[in-house]
């Protein structure tokens, strides 16, 4: 049962799709953990308290300090693209170790095909911090869906679909487009 991996559907829904799975496999490789021995339970332990919904999984894999940290959206976006495009060859090194840790902490739980991150944004200052755990006052938490820089402007298209849903009377979480480093991304409030 490939879809649910032997788990009840409501729990299997916490497992990430292509993007989060790419990060998980790269993390396993860099942690010298053979993927062939990993079970869905191990994967849920990696997700821990960073699942998209209300569920948390214990014991959680320790991914380091869980306090919020500043996020350089453009640098993280560039590194996320590298991980997605070169997932079999990108390796943890001295130059990218902090980016790698940040990416795993805020980007490995959201599902879906395209890279995304959980961030918190201060609408007054524009500062972006990690959106996992306790966030500072004055910040709002978002799912930031990176534009994938393909032939289609996915972020802008998703915003158009969001506006169409609002115009049709469908209740949606507030969403917006924001540009970082010349690249426009779609953000939806959590």
Predicted features and spans:
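Phosphate/dinucleotide-binding and metal-coordinating scaffold of catalytic cores
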Residues: 1-190
